[in-house]
């Protein structure tokens, strides 16, 4: 299954100073042949976070975009359009979302399910039950 990488996983992979850089690199090295994906949400989130002055080792917006562009220009990467809607109850069970912090993760998991892929994150608290049809294979926690 192709892996949709969470913003924090992208940060860890592309920032050598990130506390989880080695863990993310080890994971992607073992999984790269299956491919990885990004979407508008993860790309924009990466650029927004890494370019904030409060980020531990911030870079300019232009540098962040260039860094991500270089990472995606590989045969292993695929861009996924955000083709699912949080408003669709067949895609996301809103009764399972109990906090605003769960919204983006549930959406990204649903996007991975729609693409028959898996969502890769450091977040330990993602509820599979929020996305109808999601199984353990659709979620990888590093």
UniProtKB/Swiss-Prot annotation:
- Where does the UniProt entry say this protein principally localizes? secreted
Location relative to the cell: Secreted
Write out the GO cellular component annotations.
Answer: extracellular region
Specify the PINc domain's residue ranges: 4-126
Q: Name one GO molecular function term.
A: magnesium ion binding
Q: Where does Mg(2+) bind?
A: 6, 105
Supply the EC number(s). 3.1.-.-
The cofactor named in the record is:
Mg(2+)
Tell me the keywords, alphabetical order.
Hydrolase, Magnesium, Metal-binding, Nuclease, Secreted, Toxin-antitoxin system
Looking up InterPro entries in the UniProt record yields:
Mtu_PIN, PIN-like_dom_sf, PIN_dom, VapC_family
Supply one GO BP term. negative regulation of growth
Family that this chain belongs to: Belongs to the PINc/VapC protein family.
Q: What does this protein do?
A: Toxic component of a type II toxin-antitoxin (TA) system. An RNase. Its cognate antitoxin is VapB44.
Under what name is this protein listed? Answer: Ribonuclease VapC44
* Annotated gene: vapC44
């Amino acid at each position: 299954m192709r892996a949709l990488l969470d913003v924090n996983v992208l940060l860890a992979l592309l920032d050598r100073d990130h506390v989880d850089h080695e863990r993310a690199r080890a994971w992607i090295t073992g999984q790269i042949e299956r491919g990885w994906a990004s979407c508008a949400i993860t790309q924009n989130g990466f650029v927004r976070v890494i370019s904030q002055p409060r980020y531990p080792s911030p870079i300019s917006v232009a540098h962040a975009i260039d860094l991500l562009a270089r990472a995606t220009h590989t045969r292993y990467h695929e861009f996924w359009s955000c083709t699912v809607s949080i408003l669709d109850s067949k895609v996301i069970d809103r009764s399972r979302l109990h906090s605003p912090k769960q919204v983006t993760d549930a959406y990204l998991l649903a996007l991975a399910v729609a693409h028959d892929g898996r969502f890769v994150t450091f977040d330990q608290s993602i509820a599979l039950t929020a996305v109808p049809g999601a199984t353990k294979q659709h979620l990888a926690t590093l």
